[in-house]
């Protein structure tokens, strides 16, 4: 594979994913006073999609360049571990320990659950 095509695929996917995350953040601003719903929703959606797509593309061939676009670019741009970590740290920094631990626990446990749900949906309904 041409490395330049890989770079372009990741850059384009990253732009789309980052814009989607920004749109989610804007859409959740009204309800996101005490809890970072934008990051939470973007990360869970990314987990669901990686479960769906990874499972699906184990059986259906797609090019390496398109995989880079989807997984490294789009889903990498949509999800954000650094923002999640900073938001969690912010809870601890302000003494909101229950919210911090709750956010940490919910994000990790529901993220893993969404990957599993994505795999299940893909195997049960898409890969018959």
Curated annotation (Swiss-Prot):
**UniProt entry keywords in alphabetical sequence:** Cell inner membrane, Cell membrane, Ion channel, Ion transport, Membrane, Metal-binding, Sodium, Transmembrane, Transmembrane helix, Transport
Cytoplasm in keyword set: no
Q: Which GO terms describe its cellular component?
A: plasma membrane
Segments crossing the lipid bilayer: 4-24, 37-57, 65-85, 101-121
Q: Does the keyword Transmembrane helix apply?
A: yes
Q: What does this protein do?
A: Fluoride-specific ion channel. Important for reducing fluoride concentration in the cell, thus reducing its toxicity.
Q: Which family does it belong to?
A: Belongs to the fluoride channel Fluc/FEX (TC 1.A.43) family.
Recorded protein name is Fluoride-specific ion channel FluC
- Organism field: Desulfotalea psychrophila (strain LSv54 / DSM 12343)
């Amino acid at each position: 594979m041409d490395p330049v095509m890989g770079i372009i695929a990741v850059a384009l996917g990253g732009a789309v994913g980052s814009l989607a995350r920004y749109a989610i953040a804007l859409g959740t601003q009204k309800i996101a006073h005490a809890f970072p719903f934008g990051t939470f929703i973007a990360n869970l959606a990314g987990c669901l999609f990686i479960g769906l797509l990874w499972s699906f593309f184990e059986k259906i061939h797609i090019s390496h360049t398109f995989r880079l676009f989807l997984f490294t670019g789009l889903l990498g741009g949509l999800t954000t571990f650094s923002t999640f970590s900073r938001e969690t740290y912010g809870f601890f920094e302000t003494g909101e320990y229950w919210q911090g631990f709750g956010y940490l626990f919910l994000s990790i446990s529901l993220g893993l659950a969404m990957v599993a749900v994505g795999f299940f949906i893909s195997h049960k309904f898409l890969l018959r």
